[in-house]
Amino acid sequence: MKINIKEFTGKCSCGRDHQLVVDDVILEEGALKKLPEILNKEPYNQYKHLVMVCDDNTYEAAGKEVEKLLNGISVIKLDPENLHANEIGVAKVKEQLDPIKEVDCMIAVGSGTIHDLTRYNAYERKIPFISVPTAASVDGYVSTVAAMSWYGFKKSMIAESPILVVADSRIITDAPMRLTASGVGDLLGKYTALADWKITNILDGEYICDCICEMEYDALDKLKESLDGLSNRDINAYEELMYGLLLSGLAMQMTGHSRPASGAEHHMAHFWEMAVINDEIDAYHGEKVGVGLIQVSDIYHEAVKYLKEENFKLEDHVDIETDLIEKTFTNKELCESIKKTNDPNLLDLINPKVLREKTEEIIKIIEEIPKADEIVAMLEKVQGVKSLEDIGFTPDMKEKTAGVAPYIRDRITFMRILKFYDFYDDVIK
């Protein structure tokens, strides 16, 4: 599948001049074997001292081949057990990276964690890196930030975006199905992310790019058509999934933020990853996003029932729930960080009168989101996790999460806006 990067750059009807950091994306069967040829051409032939970062599993999947193809490359191979994108993982990479005298480019061979550890270390060294994904498991391959758990804080750290992506669809097709299901969950999460973006746009005029929204909806349509193919290991279906995930990352570069890819569903996933009211859970990021999506879809569609009745009441003003934040985030430093994130109060931007006037438009936007049972059916096709219980939670985690998760990011979502409505407590249960 050919991805023409130039199609995503330049002047757009939204009024912005979209730019990308990544120079090229190659997504096709046998792409890995082209790596030496690609690196011998400009602008990549300037890099003479390459270091590959992988773990034991991704070394077997693709790293071993990269080592053969690129004679003399240095290899940092990590133990995948308990390997996370955190300060410990960063230190493990640095421990092997620091003794290497000359490094002018890094290569990440793996999925989400390996990429975040590589991009963070590349940023610290002020050198570029190349992405070699081994699974269609996450949308962050071309991200400009590293999603890190930093001393217990869930943070988006400034980091390097890859200058080149070489995604071999045969390797991706052969990845464990659980990783693929994680990617499906992450990509499906764009339904609520886009809805949150569109609702905020009509309420407070936040910038939005309709072209990016349409690109992502098109990728979602193709994903739905590819679900049977994914379960049958059809390489074309895997290319469609990988394309959608890469497109999501490119959309973030085009806008300069994560709005096109992250909404209330991601806030739930990130909240669980912080483990403030729950233990650490053994679930991939995309699995948590998929489960979060199901909860958000259920809440939003339940809200539509009340919106259609038109007899709801709205608060004149919604204050930050400081007591809830303090009760939830018992670590003093973390609590202060969350409070700072919510100062000023984003809901001050929402005019209740406008909120009521836009009811029909809000209903229309929410009805574009598949209902919870439809999402469950899609995830079942790829053997994905599909409930709170599947990731180790009890059903009451839905209400606990819905109330506080909006506060972990300085971003308006409909989940946060729901706090204006008198039916709020009923729909989050």
Where are these regions (language model features)?
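N-terminal low-complexity or amphipathic/hydrophobic leaders
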Residues: 29, 45-59, 179-183, 394, ...
